[in-house]
Amino acid sequence: MGNYLLRKLSCLGENQKKPKKGNPDEERKRQEMTTFERKLQDQDKKSQEVSSTSNQENENGSGSEEVCYTVINHIPHQRSSLSSNDDGYENIDSLTRKVRQFRERSETEYALLRTSVSRPCSCTHEHDYEVVFPH
């Protein structure tokens, strides 16, 4: 959409640059529009420079993006905990961050393999998950 808008503004600018006889108020409006158009083009150029720089970093492999995996191992034919008293993962105590002893019934086991520390928080609240099934 940005490119479309830029093309539209460029066409407007070319039409405005043609000398026309008319009302002095119209001429002043054209000049103001041309100034506005230049500001928009400058902003677009700056944003293109920033995006191309970030793309080059990712292509060169020097970007700070890391891939994080979480393993979820669910033992079949056994029900996981549905208790509302459990905070976070069902077999990891939220206060001590230690694995709780399994209750009499089996539960789903979770393990965080790696997390990204250097990367800033994502803009989206969605998380990517990978499901791993036992062989």
From Swiss-Prot:
Claim: Cell membrane is one of the keywords in the record: no
Plastid listed as a keyword: no
Annotated region (Disordered), positions in chain: 1-68
Transmembrane segments: none
Biased composition (Basic and acidic residues): 22-48
Domain of life: Eukaryota
Bias kind Low complexity: ranges: 51-66
Coiled coil: 26-50
One matching Pfam family: HGAL
Record keywords, A-Z: Coiled coil
GO terms of biological process kind: regulation of B cell receptor signaling pathway; regulation of lymphocyte migration
PANTHER family, per database record: GERMINAL CENTER-ASSOCIATED SIGNALING AND MOTILITY-LIKE PROTEIN (PTHR35351:SF1)
Identification of the protein by name: Germinal center-associated signaling and motility-like protein
Organism: Homo sapiens
Taxonomic lineage of the native organism: Eukaryota, Metazoa, Chordata, Craniata, Vertebrata
